[in-house]
UniProtKB/Swiss-Prot annotation:
It comes from Azoarcus sp. (strain BH72). The keyword Isomerase does not apply. Keywords: Glycosyltransferase, Transferase. Signal peptide: none annotated. This is Pyrimidine/purine nucleoside phosphorylase. HAMAP family: Nucleos_phosphorylase_PpnP. Catalyzes the phosphorolysis of diverse nucleosides, yielding D-ribose 1-phosphate and the respective free bases. Can use uridine, adenosine, guanosine, cytidine, thymidine, inosine and xanthosine as substrates. Also catalyzes the reverse reactions. One of its GO terms (molecular function) is purine-nucleoside phosphorylase activity. It is an enzyme of class 2 (transferase). SUPFAM superfamilies: RmlC-like cupins.
Amino acid sequence: MGITEKLDGVAVTTKANVYFDGKCVSHSVRFADGTGKSVGVILPSILTFNTGAPEVMEGVAGSCRVRLKGETTWNTYGAGESYQVPGNSSFDIEVVGEPYHYICHFG
């Protein structure tokens, strides 16, 4: 999978979504067909996210380690790689060193 460098034809919510005392910051984008994504960055930390809808997390820069709910194994993902998170679940993410830039594809 190649790295998504830009998203065309979107409306961007200018106020950022700020989570975990600023360790994760994202902006919501909406396409003309009503679908949405978020584009963000996670600073070095270990965080736990909960999901409503299924998500595909696409790495744009940096790297992270991810552990899905109910699993004991951490998997590493970098730029150009993605991982899937089921809906109504959670995942732990660890970022060390450089910030991890991502696109979250919902649904």
